[in-house]
UniProtKB/Swiss-Prot annotation:
UniProt name for this protein: Uncharacterized protein C119.18
PANTHER family in alphabetical order: TP53-REGULATED INHIBITOR OF APOPTOSIS 1
Keyword Mitochondrion attributed: no
Keyword rRNA-binding: no
Amino acid sequence: MSSSVSEECTPAKKKYDACFNDWYANKFLKGDLHNRDCDELFAEYKSCLLKALKTKKIDPLLEAARKED
């Protein structure tokens, strides 16, 4: 698994990736489409990413790109 955009978010990304991969292989492919085991880990990773994007001043670039669509 790759590192996160921000080094401080890599541990949260790795936890989420492991959870997602387990869910996908062991639940989703067996028909359990509504499992929410990884939601909390995703929220933690997303929060870290959003904070890092603001710190690195990347968030204005993302907003501008979204407006172009």
